[in-house]
């Protein structure tokens, strides 16, 4: 299929404002957050920005008929090159699909579109007393769809797990253009765990157009402890001792001397620059349990 004819078919699906093929418009989409020296420059032939699952399915069917490769993309914050069009073709960018469709407080889930920003979801559910636990370092800009594609984690995965632990069901457009729904709110869905197969598949098995995500209740109390050590080995032993004592922090991060100096130079956070290492230990839960765990660590 000629490029002009392909563009016209795509515009008929998503509108002229949702299709880009001019080289200057494609510059943004030939990169993601991965290292250019490793990933290289990978420019798609055309970028499509759908607003509905039906539009995604229609675009995939057009690509299949034309024999054109498809690359799904969220915010492009990934570091592994998964959002790059390595073989050109059509890039389907899902950042216009940003609706939170349902918040179910009784069953503790939300149904969202893939373009919803990770942190925005937690800010939306916070007034209801819940948050979305996976918290990648790019959570201010990364999308739920991207989190699902990469099975993203974050500092709080120590206690709460990674994205796969918080996805109950998915609406997915398959490479054939067929739309399916996997999983659901039931604790044990019958049949093969297709949801588990799809999470982390980086868009190779299908394109997520809706997600039923597990919501976690906001903790009653949170306490963050900062501990300085003369050397990194001592900090490492402290980590082992905390876990061995039966304390499960919500997050547990270590900074070496070089990182401490870099953070202080940039943010003046107040960390001791003469320390060999610093531990940041976040404890959350019921107030009494947080106080008890904090005392044990100290």
Task: Report each predicted region and the residues it spans.
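Noncatalytic alpha-helical scaffold of FAD-dependent oxidoreductases
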Residues: 1-298
